[in-house]
Amino acid sequence: MGARASVLSGGKLDKWEKIQLRPGGKKKYRLKHLVWASRELERFALNPNLLETVEGCRQIIRQLQPSLQTGSEELRSLFNTVATLYWVHQSIQVRDTKEALDKLEEEQNRTQQKTQQGKADKGVSQNYPIVQNLQGQMVHQALSPRTLNAWVKVIEEKAFSPEVIPMFSALSEGATPQDLNTMLNTVGGHQAAMQMLKDTINEEAAEWDRMHPVQAGPIPPGQIREPRGSDIAGTTSTLQEQITWMTSNPPIPVGEIYKRWIILGLNKIVRMYSPVSILDIRQGPKEPFRDYVDRFFRVLRAEQATQEVKNWMTETLLVQNANPDCRTILKALGSGATLEEMMTACQGVGGPGHKARVLAEAMSQVTNSAVMMQRGNFKGQRRIIKCFNCGKEGHLARNCRAPRKKGCWKCGKEGHQMKDCSERQANFFREVLASQQREARKFSSEQTRANSPTSRELWVRGEDNPLSETGNERSGTGSSFNFPQITLWQRPVVTVKVGGQLREALLDTGADDTVLEEINLPGKWKPKMIGGIGGFIKVRQYDQVCMEICGQKAIGTVLVGPTPVNIIGRNMLTQIGCTLNFPISPIETVPVKLKPGMDGPKVKQWPLTEEKIKALVEICTEMEKEGKISKIGPENPYNTPVFAIKKKDSTKWIKLVDFRELNKRTPDFWEVQLGIPHPAGLKKKKSVTVLDVGDAYFSVPLDKDFRKYTAFTIPSINNETPGIRYQYNVLPQGWKGSPAIFQCSMTKILEPFRRKNPDMVLYQYMDDLYVGSDLEIGQHRAKIEELREHLLRWGFTTPDKKHQKEPPFLWMGYELHPDKWTVQPIQLPDKDSWTVNDIQKLVGKLNWASQIFPGIKVKQLCKLLRGVKALTDIVPLTAEAELELAENREILKEPVHGVYYDPSKDLIAEIQKQGHGQWTYQIYQEPYKNLKTGKYARIRSAHTNDVKQLTEVVQKVAMESIVIWGKTPKFRLPIQKETWGTWWTEYWQATWIPEWEFVNTPPLVKLWYQLETEPIVGAETFYVDGAANRETKQGKAGYVTDKGRQKVISITETTNQKTELQAIHLALQDSGSEVNIVTDSQYALGIIQAQPDKSESELVNQIIEQLIKKDRVYLSWVPAHKGIGGNEQVDKLVSSGIRKVLFLDGIDKAQEEHEKYHNNWRAMASDFNLPPVVAKEIVASCDKCQLKGEAIHGQVDCSPGIWQLDCTHLEGKIILVAVHVASGYIEAEVIPAETGQETAYFILKLAGRWPVRVIHTDNGSNFTSAVVKAACWWADIKQEFGIPYNPQSQGVVESMNKELKKIIGQVREQAEHLKTAVQMAVFIHNFKRKGGIGGYSAGERIIDIIATDIQTKELQKQITKIQNFRVYYRDSREPIWKGPAKLLWKGEGAVVIQNSEIKVVPRRKAKIIRDYGKQMAGDDCVAGRQDED
């Protein structure tokens, strides 16, 4: 203790002991706090000696601060202690902890800019898990639970969509291989995806080992070893080795390398989930441009290409693959157009409507010019017209081709078009007032955001006003102007000055004009009649009258007449910036826009019954009074259907709006909260309160610019009157953005209260609030009232009927007591007959109960739901399901409670096996006091064992613990250390093993048999194999032993995989207690090496039984068809009569030819009758053919006469390549110069050898030259220019260039000159590599295509000729000739004809005549007199 107490001494210790723990509190810091902090630092793996210096405290603060958000109360206390000590070391006086934290925050804010600049200079990310400690050593900082939780949520929500890759890249910034494996382990449940990822990692690791061979000899002292592929993957390297490699000089970035491998694998997985190619994305003739863009970018994200290539694809393919209408517009915009400009320009383009508009525009221009010719002799020079839309002269707005300008062309306001504008024509002050209105509108919206009151009020701009109010919470956020506020609890009557006379007048925002009682005003007036509620009255109209309202001056029209009350109308109120403010939360609105290029919903309202219309009118009238909705006019073109339903067991109606269409057009919102809070994560508190926010969504304002899209209409019966139109001012129920915006807004509102009361725990989920504290009940309730007042100031009410003050508290489906919690009471129904829906609800209730009731099982009940059943189908309960339900009823009879979390104690998770693949677990801190319980019964693969299932349970519990408590528990597992260790050493995800201990809770988990790692000396060796015929389903399985024994059995209705397993079962049956088995089946090896103890396959279960009986078993794999002794013998044995076996006969010749030509495996399999696996093995064993992948071809125009030409460069020389698009056939030559003359000569040679109709080239100077154009003209060749990767472009030749260079690389050493190697490569490509359509080589394919083309043309001629004939025919024994029918085909014995249907008529009953263009009439023998063909 002495060493730890030496952190402070002398005067500093005195200063320390004068600092208060809390502002105004009695308790102060003591020496014991330093001792406690030293011990805590050791728990967090930090050096306690750091507390002795300023720099050391700064280091601790940097380490602890990022974890405060998810950390425990102990962590926060430690941080507060170190922060206070930091200022004592600097001899800076602080009174209490809060002041120390405030000063620390100020200092960090001052240095933030400097720190950011330092980061930019270094160019190094500060998010690395490897950090430098005080001693200068590089240490590892594990990934935070928050990061792992975010990664898990991404996979759960996005599956393996393209967004997963950038998210993984961001979350794993600077991670070590161990960190990356931890991330993979947390999503290890996706086995198919993980297997693909594993295969990719293994391939890349093998490639790394091949490219980085091990250095011979021992490693010199002081030098670290080079990492192998498995080291980079984190399976054979320690964390310290990884850190050493990553921080050495020069560094070996094993983390980044491994991350690159994982991203390669993720790309493959994404490809599997998103198999569409970017080349396939084309805009349909009538498809809206915005939908096409959505599809394009969705597929683009999945493309495996660099960002530069993706940018290029966006610039070119997006335009090229648009439909002709949109493409014309996009090309007119130019190459620099943004996506938003494209969307705007193409809005509404496409389909018959667009074509009609274009035609109308053309017709109107023709008509106008004709009219001008007729009127040319009358008036003088024609007035120049100007477009409202683009501002240019010479055309009208309706004929304008520019993108339509937003808003009305008359008044400039948005939300309606000029034809719907309600502005009156005779508005002499329109331009002046419009500018003032715009200013007032802008001004008032800013003020509304900052200082909107909590009751309905009228605001008027003013300089001085004693009525101005500002709340404490909002002080400092308002505008620099002072706005008077006039509440509407009484009539808003103010004193105004008109023409120097004072009058009391009502501020009426619903009146258009200002009307006063008899008052003498100077100036001229004119009579006018105005309509009011009581009828029409005669008034005098005075123009340009000056009026002063609340210190503001306005000039406008005043009407004087017998009005019952003086009214100041909108013509004056708008000039002084008067606004009407509703009781909506004054928080800043979240800006929302529609998806780019989309417009709002325009869905018609469907008919409603009379009672529903009355209910909706009543509901909406009340909502309008409360300011939640506003009436709108016909200028709003949008609409969403509305309807009403009755509450369950009630006569009250509920209004529902069908926002599905608006939701489609609204961008996605990121859910602020990733899940619901769990009571097991709550800390025990002395006082607790549960609140509910009333009308939660309706208390948060909706973005003003977005409100128009929420419009809806209440119809009338029999269309008696126009529908009543409304739009929402607040967040609507059913709109996709409401939950996220509400959560975000509520978090901002609660932030000041949280800051002010850090010792109070406040859980917020939607409109449910849980508040806990360690205060006495009186103080606690005072704080609750303070919270309620705080919420009320922001417009949120907390109804008394949902204000829970006394336990038990009902919260989020749970029942909370002061020192325990449970789920709310669960009653299981007792039914004679169960429907599918009943069982689904029952399983849901049991799953909910399982989080606190241990031992709940649902496996047998879930089995009842297998298959596709209707919800109302009756399902009989099986005996097992009835037993399971009865056991669950017994469990639920006894009430069970969970306790609350204590951060000072460790978490312990205990797992038990229940049998039949079901598991249960409890998480606790003290024995018999569970925090929560759970169950697991998911079987992820057909063949599994208990150890594998146990690891899945451990994974689930660990993930659950990270989410609820932010840390993993210590596990107590029913398995021996040796069994667990044996399994994990073989299991591929052995990178993260949780802390655990053995607990002897029967039944224990064990491995029922163990496979040997080395052959058993002295044991008999069985070579096993199986074969099956795919067509007949007949098969054989057997074995051959090293002692001369052999056995073969015949099997029916089987497959190759089953026969391989049957052969292993046969060997196990006929062998002794020790046996060596050799198979060539990876399938069978994979199943048995996983050591399953149960399987869905009966055959695998039989093999497991045999394995358990054996003392020792060794299982090995050898490749098939390689001439390996016993394997070859047994293969011939089981293949007899089943399949044709060709072994070594052609292998030598194939290998010899491959060394010369490096032909692909398809060509060798075809030419030498080799099995594909053997041919692939020959290619795999060739060191020059280890280039990954083959050229991928997009969809291009594959007409027989189309060729693509391009120049490529190699060894400083130019190779001119021509590719026949349909076949892939290549012609190539090394040319002396990239000139038009050489290119034209090459084209003429090509045309002399093959039929060339069209050539596609790029825009190179040699291809665009006059010489090439002349050659093409002479040879009657059409020349087209394209863009790479685009249909009818250069994609094929670009990929063939790569393929050609690859082949040249393989044969280059066989030729002295490059031109020789080029021709060798052309020969190999055209005749020695097979594949693609028909399995031909390119040379065979081009000949086949040309021959087929000739035959097709000839056949077409015959068809055309045949179609000139008509057929008269007789049916069965009827003597009457029928017809004429159309001749489709003429054979030797019959003809095929088409009349009302297609028929086959014998040749002897048909008369074929030539169609001379006139109808043959009558049923006589006219047909017989015609010439028969």
Swiss-Prot record:
DNA-binding region: 1365-1411
Biological-process GO terms, alphabetical: DNA integration; DNA recombination; establishment of integrated proviral latency; proteolysis; symbiont entry into host cell; symbiont-mediated activation of host apoptosis; symbiont-mediated suppression of host gene expression; viral genome integration into host DNA
Region of interest (Interaction with membrane phosphatidylinositol 4,5-bisphosphate and RNA), ranges: 14-33
Residues covered by the Reverse transcriptase domain: 626-816
Keywords linked to the UniProt accession: Activation of host caspases by virus, AIDS, Aspartyl protease, Capsid protein, DNA integration, DNA recombination, DNA-binding, DNA-directed DNA polymerase, Endonuclease, Eukaryotic host gene expression shutoff by virus, Eukaryotic host translation shutoff by virus, Host cell membrane, Host cytoplasm, Host endosome, Host gene expression shutoff by virus, Host membrane, Host nucleus, Host-virus interaction, Hydrolase, Lipid-binding, Lipoprotein, Magnesium, Membrane, Metal-binding, Modulation of host cell apoptosis by virus, Multifunctional enzyme, Myristate, Nuclease, Nucleotidyltransferase, Phosphoprotein, Protease, Repeat, RNA-binding, RNA-directed DNA polymerase, Transferase, Viral genome integration, Viral nucleoprotein, Viral penetration into host nucleus, Viral release from host cell, Virion, Virion maturation, Virus entry into host cell, Zinc, Zinc-finger
Regulation affecting activity: Protease: The viral protease is inhibited by many synthetic protease inhibitors (PIs), such as amprenavir, atazanavir, indinavir, loprinavir, nelfinavir, ritonavir and saquinavir. Use of protease inhibitors in tritherapy regimens permit more ambitious therapeutic strategies. Reverse transcriptase/ribonuclease H: RT can be inhibited either by nucleoside RT inhibitors (NRTIs) or by non nucleoside RT inhibitors (NNRTIs).
Motif (Tryptophan repeat motif): 980-996
One CC-aspect GO term: viral nucleocapsid
Record: residues binding Mg(2+) 2: D1025, E1060, D1080, D1131
Sequence segments annotated as region (Interaction with human PPIA/CYPA and NUP153): 185-223
Region Interaction with membrane phosphatidylinositol 4,5-bisphosphate, residue ranges: 73-77
EC numbers: 3.4.23.16, 2.7.7.49, 2.7.7.7, 3.1.26.13
Site keyed Cleavage: positions: 128-129, 359-360, 372-373, 427-428, 435-436, 483-484, 582-583, 1022-1023, 1142-1143
Domain Peptidase A2 stretches: 503-572
Region feature (Interaction with host CALM1): 8-43
Annotated coiled-coil segments of the chain: none
Protein name: Gag-Pol polyprotein
